[in-house]
Amino acid sequence: MLKMTLKEVLESIKPKDEERKKVKLIMDELRGIAQEVIEESGEEIEVKFVGSLAKDTYLSGDHDIDMFLAFPLSIPVEKLKSKGLEIAESIGKRLESYEISYAEHPYVRGVYKGYQVDIVPCYNVRDWREVRTAVDRSILHTEWVLKNIKGKNDEVRLLKRFLKGINAYGSEVYRRGFSGYLAEILVIKFGSFLKVLEKADFMLRQKIIDPENWLKREPEIAMKTVKREIEEDKPIIVIDPVDPRRNVAANLSWERYGLFYFKAREFLTKPSTELFFPRDKKGNYLEVLRRKGTHLVTLTFEPPNLVDDIIIPQVERTAKGLARQLELEGFRVLGIDYGRDFIFLEVEEIERPRIKIKKGPLYFTHHGLRFFDKNDIVWIEGKELASEKSSLGFIVDVLEDILRKGQFSAGKNVKDAIVGANIIIDFVPKALAQEAYLFLSREKFRVK
């Protein structure tokens, strides 16, 4: 049963010969275009392909191409950015379409014969000591995987498809799952897809995975990495095989690892292709609200034009800050969710009493006299004072007051946008209906 299931999955995700030939042809053509532009520029630049296509760990139909323009180390960073973008843009002009995108430094994203191509300037590094920009390691990652994969390419494909199926794939900040490189490392380390699943509990308890023995080779640097990641409470620490300063699993959240933890156990107990290819989780968020008897507060806003890596963590911080303030104001917040341009807050009630009763100090103390002077309605309960104060009752009024005063923890780039947010109760724009359902039904991280 287990072997048959894996065979069936592999047949649908492994690229056929015709697809492989087409991918190779496209990459060869892109290399030719890039080299023509480089020759015309007179620069010494090497064209290198990185990522799953270069490593042959890609899934059928997943054809995003990463083409790196590797500059000599002698080039200053500023020149790398300016000249790199100039050459990348010249290549982009020879494709069907292109646009300039921004990460640590600008790069070009284009389309060539239906294939998405990222053209990224970087340094032509040989080891971790030469790394100057975040993207430089990608060359080393590709070289390490090619050297160590030893025919386990299909095992990596199975793990990637499994992680996609359980919604735990992708290390982007809005997902915080397993990266493709992390999946490759785990298969190389443990030997197969099934063995990685069997180690789900072991990895969590061992905590540290060190494929290249950096803790022995570079103990001071590697231990610094381990201590930093433990302090940040990461689920697992996978010391990058090509750089002891980095945890490959740094972006992996406890929630996404939890999905892997339970779904691995489920698959080993009851193998099924459905974990690889699940049915869409669709439903009506309004029905969920009626069933639960709770309320959904939605804030929608226009975020600044910055990349998700900057925006999403700041929206997360703001959502948590607003939830804390609502709790302090007497509203019970049952959960939060967020995206680039929205925040969801599930609350138990949207109305609270319109008065606040506050217990005060002993009436015959200095603090008691201050309490008496400060409040309008004051009475005695035994030796202590108490006061009554009018307050806003409706959650929208309370939230608007919190936003207006700015007394909440927020990301600096998004605070102004969120202060002017639209606040909606028990209804969301059509574009957010599915997100609202997944959030309210707990399907997003549901394991039972």
From Swiss-Prot:
Belongs to the tRNA nucleotidyltransferase/poly(A) polymerase family. Archaeal CCA-adding enzyme subfamily. Keywords: ATP-binding, Magnesium, Metal-binding, Nucleotide-binding, Nucleotidyltransferase, RNA repair, RNA-binding, Transferase, tRNA processing. The lineage of its organism: Archaea, Methanobacteriati, Methanobacteriota, Thermococci, Thermococcales. PANTHER family: CCA-ADDING ENZYME. GO terms for molecular function: ATP binding; CCA tRNA nucleotidyltransferase activity; magnesium ion binding; tRNA binding. It comes from Pyrococcus abyssi (strain GE5 / Orsay). It comes from the Archaea. SUPFAM superfamilies: Nucleotidyltransferase, PAP/Archaeal CCA-adding enzyme, C-terminal domain, PAP/OAS1 substrate-binding domain. ATP binds at residues 52, 55, 141, 160, 169. The gene is cca. A single active site specifically recognizes both ATP and CTP and is responsible for their addition. This is CCA-adding enzyme. GO terms for biological process: RNA repair; tRNA 3'-terminal CCA addition. Mg(2+) binds at residues 64, 66, 118. Catalyzes the addition and repair of the essential 3'-terminal CCA sequence in tRNAs without using a nucleic acid template. Adds these three nucleotides in the order of C, C, and A to the tRNA nucleotide-73, using CTP and ATP as substrates and producing inorganic pyrophosphate. tRNA 3'-terminal CCA addition is required both for tRNA processing and repair. Also involved in tRNA surveillance by mediating tandem CCA addition to generate a CCACCA at the 3' terminus of unstable tRNAs. While stable tRNAs receive only 3'-terminal CCA, unstable tRNAs are marked with CCACCA and rapidly degraded.
